[in-house]
Swiss-Prot record:
Listed name of the protein: Xanthomonalisin
Cellular location(s): Secreted
Entry cofactors: Ca(2+)
Processing and modification events after translation: Autocatalytically processed.
Species lineage: Bacteria, Pseudomonadati, Pseudomonadota, Gammaproteobacteria, Lysobacterales
């Protein structure tokens, strides 16, 4: 039964009707609300200055503090202004997912440690293909192009214009200038047709007024205007900077093996070339092995070198590797940033990077030293989209670690000159904000991540002596650039306005909302890290130091456990209230200004959570209680690799049937005997010549155990492949056949000056789907042309084809046979 194609046909018809006639269909809301709105009359902050005026045409930015923009500075964004959007879809079976997440993270549960693979998660909890097809059809009819569906179907990326966004989401987008930058923002919520209401979660990329910012703090004591509270130290010791590798000894982990079994990811933007160069300089100087580094670019656009952000990515990478002693692999997931000032950053790109780390499912720990005002993220739909992705990470045994923020309880307050967070006073020291108005940072407030706050660390050499709440008081924001307004540098922490309290939080708090941070590590710039940035040494702090320290520290513990622990929040909250010997409790200091904010106390508190932990002691506890004993599970049974194969001509279609009796299959690795490989679960492979090939499948389970099956596969040149995979002009490949979900692949080499390319299939029985893409192989979610026609009469036409190679895919929507494929063009 053609549910997918039928649903898609209906969706296209509905989309055409609603977009062309704006008629009768009801449109419904998503999680994406207006980023700015015009109140009737208010005191407003002029976009080009700090003076206030009264106007009835003022716009309010919908974030904490409600910043205001003079309406005279606001105009409509041009209809042809390019936009890149990420349409976030809703999870399926959310209640069942919550039950699974509770079980997979709780020692003693029958589900404990039985993590899902990405394909298993998508099958059980991802949107259906028919839902995806309907949304894709709607985007196409609205005018979006370059549409790509993420493997888990939670995100659909698309390129378009402001006009396409207006058509597709019944919103409008405005533009204005402030602080020397150009901004755009939707002043109406994003809507979708009612038929898509159960599918679409949010639409990201409709604004750039609130985006993620880095959370590192370069040591400049001369800029301090009002020192932080004098809380002393917990022991007579020094507050001094440390090399990243020193933190292993300071936090009790130097006796453990390095984290060489665990891959780690870092969310970044722009060019990472200089960061890797600096990382290699650090490891060489520290006597550590060169790191196996991978740069994974997410999305399209310009990946520019941003000198201001290089310090962030160097802080992340060098401190993770330093405290971990090395990692199996370090993956930089980097978003396009547009230019050297990263003006092209939106939440759409950052959320897509989170999702890529999850669908890759390689990194077991992912560091995010970024954040933004929680209210703005909730209004834009970013928070809802991020939470769905983080839930998949938990289900797969991955852990996102998020820096809590560097503006204390004033994450919401932005400097009127530069836009920096934490603004408290003007250059004269006059307080300009409500000091009792608190907020937290997103995505740190998510209940599906570990939120890491900051401390000021005291040591005697490389021996831990004490920690207090990180609070450096007020500093001039950017005196070298003429901005002498004053901001607070202090650890983020507090209570979410929107995220419900997770059940495991009840052991320490009666709040109905998510409370954080969970833990806290060194963050003060005065006790910060000495890292290599652009070839020189800098002393840097911030919760962007604290989060990488947790990631590297916990990577040692996960590595010792063969990555069997997974997301540790519920375990922390179950153990830490009573197992206090594992911890460095922080009992002095607060994270506000003039006695405001949250104050540290014995046990858990909103300033530093449980404090930091001793790596060695926690590893011993984890081995006894979370891995092999104390209800943590039994010895892992290895998986059993198995597969079957069907051949048609030179095409071999493999069906995986591997099993794992006490867990799940985490990854597949195929070798086809001709030098080709695949990591798909059940791949299809086209050989270039007839013969017998030795094919091997290696599967790895969720605990790292492996199994391999090897089998001989014979293919022949019969089966109508038309001269292998190359299609000749006007020569049909005939008698094509494949099983359901089987795939046949071809190429078409187009010479210079060619015109009127047509690629078509016809005849036969069953149902083959045609996909065509220039320059690279198409997939069922990434293509230049897909006709969406029932049966085997489909064609793709290109009036002015590009010179080069077009790639053709025939996919078995149902089993098909006797199909002909022909490419024709004129010279």
């Amino acid at each position: 039964m053609k549910i997918e194609k039928t649903a898609l046909t209906v969706a296209i018809a509905l989309a055409m009707s609603s977009l062309s006639a704006h008629a009768e269909d009801a449109w419904v809301s998503t999680h994406t609300q207006a980023a700015m709105s015009p109140p009737a009359s208010t005191q407003v902050l002029a976009a080009s200055s700090t003076s206030a005026t009264t106007t009835g045409n003022a716009y309010t930015l919908n974030m904490t503090g409600s910043p205001r923009i003079d309406g005279a500075a606001v105009t409509a964004l041009e209809a042809d202004h390019p936009l890149h959007v990420e349409v976030a879809l809703k999870l399926r079976n959310p209640d069942a997912l919550q039950t699974f997440l509770a079980g997979v993270t709780t020692p003693g549960s029958a589900l404990f440690g039985k993590f899902l693979t990405p394909s298993q998660f998508t099958e059980r909890f991802g949107p259906t293909q028919s839902q995806v097809d309907a949304v894709v059809a709607h985007l196409q009819q609205a005018g979006f192009t370059n549409i790509e569906v993420a493997p888990n179907r939670l995100l659909i990326s698309a390129d378009g214009t402001a006009g396409a966004a207006t058509n597709g989401f019944r919103t409008s987008i405005k533009r204005f200038s402030a602080n020397g930058r150009e901004f755009f923002a939707n002043d109406a919520p994003a809507l979708v047709p009612a038929s898509l209401g159960d599918s679409v979660n949010a639409v990201l990329g409709l604004q750039n007024v609130s985006v993620k910012h880095t959370l590192h703090h370069v040591y400049h004591p001369e800029d301090v205007t009002v020192p932080g509270p004098n809380v002393g130290t917990q022991a007579a010791a020094a507050v001094a900077a440390h090399h990243p590798q020193d933190f292993a000894a300071i936090y009790g982990g130097s006796s453990l093996p390095a984290a060489t079994n665990t891959a780690v990811g870092i969310i970044t933007w722009g060019s990472i070339t200089q960061t890797v160069t600096d990382l290699n300089s650090f490891t060489s100087g520290a006597g550590l092995a060169t790191v196996n580094s991978t740069i994974t670019k997410v999305g399209s656009g310009t990946f520019a070198n941003d000198p201001d952000s290089n310090g962030e990515w160097s802080l992340d990478s060098q401190d993770i590797v330093g405290i971990a002693g090395g990692v199996k692999q370090l993956i930089f997931y980097t978003s396009a940033n547009g230019d050297s000032s990263s003006s092209g950053i939106t939440d759409a790109g950052i959320t897509a990077s989170y999702n890529r780390a999850v669908t890759d499912n390689i990194a077991k720990l992912i560091n995010v030293s970024l954040g933004e005002d929680e209210t703005a993220a909730q209004q834009s739909g970013t928070q809802a989209a991020d939470d769905a992705i983080f839930q998949q990470a938990v289900a797969q045994g991955q852990t996102f670690s998020i820096a809590s923020g560097d503006a204390g309880v004033y994450q919401w307050s932005t400097d009127p000159t530069s836009g920096s967070p934490g603004y408290v006073a003007n250059s004269a020291g006059t307080v300009k904000i409500d000091l009792t108005h608190y907020s937290v940072s997103e995505p740190a407030s998510s209940p599906y991540v570990i939120q890491v706050g900051g401390t000021t660390l005291s040591t005697s050499g490389t021996t831990w002596s004490g920690e207090t709440v990180w609070n450096e008081g007020l500093s001039a924001i950017a005196p070298s650039q003429g901005d002498n307004n004053q901001r607070l540098w202090a650890t983020g922490g507090g209570v979410s306005l929107y995220e419900a309290a997770p059940s495991w939080q009840s052991s320490v708090s009666s709040s109905t909302k998510r409370v954080g941070p969970d833990l806290a590590f060194d963050a003060a710039s005065s006790s910060g890290a000495l890292i290599v940035v652009n070839g020189s040494t800098e002393q840097v702090g911030g919760t962007s130091l604290a989060s990488p320290l947790f990631v590297g520290a916990f990577a040692r513990i996960e590595s010792a456990a063969n990555n069997a622990i997974g997301f540790p929040a519920s375990k922390f909250y179950q153990a830490f209230p009573t197992q206090t010997s594992l911890l460095h409790d922080v009992t002095s200091g607060n994270n506000g200004y003039q006695s405001h904010g949250y104050t540290a106390a014995t046990g858990f508190d909103e300033a530093t959570g449980f404090g930091s932990f001793d790596i060695g002691k926690l590893n011993t506890y984890a081995q006894a209680n979370w891995v092999t004993g104390g209800g943590g599970g039994s010895t892992n049974a290895p998986p059993v690799a198995n597969f079957s194969v069907a051949t048609t001509g030179l095409v071999a279609t493999f069906t995986d049937s591997s099993t794992d009796s006490d867990g799940s299959i985490a990854s597949h690795a195929w070798t086809f005997g001709d030098g080709s490989t695949s990591t798909a679960t059940s791949p299809s492979h086209t050989y270039s010549a007839a013969g017998t090939y030795s094919v091997a499948e290696t599967v790895t389970d969720n605990a790292g155990a492996t199994s391999t099956k090897t089998s001989s596969v014979t293919v022949s040149s019969s089966g109508g492949t038309g001269g292998g995979t190359v299609l000749q002009n006007g020569v049909a490949a005939t008698g094509l056949s494949a099983a359901k979900n089987g795939q046949l692949k071809y190429t078409v080499a187009i010479p210079s000056g060619a015109k009127s390319l047509k690629i078509a299939i016809s005849g036969g029985t069953g149902d083959a789907d045609l996909y065509v893409k220039f320059g690279s192989a198409p997939t069922t979610s990434s293509y230049d042309c897909r006709p969406y026609v029932t049966g085997n009469t489909e064609s793709c036409s290109f009036a002015s084809p590009q010179t080069g190679t077009y790639y053709v895919l025939l996919n078995g929507y149902a089993a098909f046979s006797g199909v002909s494929l022909k490419a024709t063009w004129t010279n």
